[in-house]
Swiss-Prot record:
Coiled coil: none annotated. One of its GO terms (molecular function) is ribosome binding. The keyword Secreted does not apply. Keywords: Cell cycle, Cell division, Chaperone, Cytoplasm, Isomerase, Rotamase. Its EC number is 5.2.1.8. Gene3D superfamilies: 3.10.50.40, Trigger factor ribosome-binding domain (3.30.70.1050), Trigger factor, C-terminal domain (1.10.3120.10). GO terms for cellular component: cytoplasm. Residues 163-248 form the PPIase FKBP-type domain. GO terms for biological process: 'de novo' cotranslational protein folding; cell division; chaperone-mediated protein folding; protein transport; protein unfolding. Belongs to the FKBP-type PPIase family. Tig subfamily. Involved in protein export. Acts as a chaperone by maintaining the newly synthesized protein in an open conformation. Functions as a peptidyl-prolyl cis-trans isomerase. This is Trigger factor. It comes from Agathobacter rectalis (strain ATCC 33656 / DSM 3377 / JCM 17463 / KCTC 5835 / VPI 0990) (Eubacterium rectale). It catalyses: [protein]-peptidylproline (omega=180) = [protein]-peptidylproline (omega=0).
């Protein structure tokens, strides 16, 4: 295998990867072995048709696509190592030559880690944040806990109201025809959650158990299912049950049940302590974000588009994993929200860009400050992770590959860089706009 590197504009590069003809022949045979059981030829049993016969009937390129995929999977990682390019995106690949008896050649366009020229990062000024907790905040959290500890009861003496959960059967129609994904039975729908499109939920308010109603809505103009986008729809809905929350009394008994303390007064003190800790944690993160953003604003880097696109895709994948834990597929989420995958990627793009910029400047600070990650640092992080997973640290370390260890090492270095920045920040009370502008020009 040989690899040639061509540097392109805006921190992009093109790798041209050439694989020996012998390796292509092996991949073609692997593709044949994979596909032969699905190919039928008169006079031969399935799986027994000679490769030459299949190529004669369907053309010499019948196995090219599978063979190309096999070879790219086998060779890409090695080609990246051989190139020495610090790649920070998924590749855009193109096969430029595939022919029996000839070398297999393909290209991969990739983003290259951009160089970072740091601005001022020591002595950055951040806004001081008040972390005190008021009595009103304690009361609001108490009310929140009452809602969490509420019983769900079936309501029979009144119609659907805001905040209720209506258990419904529904079926949707466009132009009188039922559409795919528009039917459900005994679906619990919280009124006011805006889970369903348009004014669907509003039209159930005031209806009683057993009512069969027609709900008229319009799908958003930009909707995942293009055949439904912008169209009016009618849903036939039956209300099977109305459920409401019954809140517990705010007394010592509630405090005992909710928090295991003796009195409501003790519970309030515990809530105040927890809220204070939460505020302090949030304040720390907010000040870190402010400091890092100021460093980003004063630094220079040219982010390749492919790097941002890869980060957007990663964040959408992470989101899909999170909603899957609640039993919702990405397809269902997109249908309910009226969004497309591209719109979701556009939505996360600003955060994706900030994540990349933060990572790049912090890695550069770690490099310029000669921040070291010791074996003890790694052991401590493994210990923390093992505790979170309920595993033995040694076992977890055995499962970790080189890539995971390298990623952990990078994360620890970034954390140390953040600590260094925050150890040297200057705090100031929130200033007026004029003072803010003057302070900004100084940094």
């Amino acid at each position: 295998m040989s690899v040639q590197v061509e540097n392109l504009e805006h921190n992009m590069a093109k790798l041209t990867i050439e694989v020996a003809a012998e390796e292509l022949e092996k991949a073609l045979d692997s593709a044949y072995q994979k596909q032969k059981k699905q190919i039928s030829v008169p006079g031969f049993r399935k799986g027994k048709v000679p490769r030459a016969m299949i190529e004669k009937m369907y053309g010499a390129g019948v196995f090219y696509e599978d063979a190309a995929n096999i070879l790219m999977q086998q060779t890409y990682a090695g080609a990246v190592d051989e190139s020495g390019v610090d790649i920070v995106s998924r590749p855009t690949v193109e096969v430029t030559q595939i022919e029996k008896g000839q070398p297999f050649i393909y290209t991969a366009e990739v983003a290259v880690r951009p160089e970072v020229t740091l601005g001022k990062y020591m002595g950055v000024t951040v806004t001081k944040i008040d972390t005190s907790v008021s009595d009103e905040e304690v009361d609001a959290e108490l009310e929140n806990q009452r809602n969490k500890n509420a019983r769900t009861v079936t309501v029979t003496d009144r119609p659907v109201a805001e905040g209720d959960t209506a258990v419904i059967d529904f079926e949707g129609f466009v132009d009188g025809v039922a559409f795919e994904g528009g039917k459900g039975e005994n679906h619990p729908l919280e009124i006011g959650s805006h889970t369903f499109i348009d004014t669907f939920e509003d039209q159930l308010v005031g209806k009683n158990t057993g009512d069969e109603v027609e709900v008229n809505v319009t799908f958003p103009e930009k909707y995942q299912a293009e055949d439904l986008a912008g169209k009016p729809a009618t849903f036939k809905v039956k209300i099977n049950e109305i459920k409401a929350k019954e809140l517990p009394e705010l007394d010592d008994e509630f405090a005992q049940d909710a928090a295991g303390v003796d009195t409501l007064a003790e519970y309030k003190e515990e809530i105040k302590k927890n809220l204070t800790e939460k505020k302090e944690t949030e304040a720390k993160k907010t000040k870190e974000d402010e400091a890092i953003q100021k460093i980003i604003d004063k630094s220079k880097m040219d982010l390749p588009e492919a790097m941002i696109e890869t980060q957007c895709e990663t964040m959408v994948e992470e989101f899909a994993q999170r909603i899957a834990q609640s039993g919702l597929t990405m397809e269902q989420y997109l249908q309910f929200s009226g969004m497309t995958v591209d719109q979701l990627k556009d939505q996360v793009r600003p955060e994706a860009t900030t994540r990349i910029q933060s990572s790049l400047v912090l890695e550069q600070i770690a490099k310029e400050e000669n921040i070291e990650v010791t074996d003890a640092d790694i052991d401590a992080e493994v210990e923390k992770m093992a505790k979170a997973y309920g595993m033995e640290a040694d076992k977890l370390k055995e499962y970790m590959g080189d890539a995971e260890k390298e990623s952990m090492k990078k994360d620890i270095a970034i954390t140390k860089a953040v600590d260094l920045i925050m150890d040297n920040v200057k705090e100031r009370a929130k200033a007026k706009k004029k003072a803010d502008a003057e302070e900004s020009t100084e940094e």
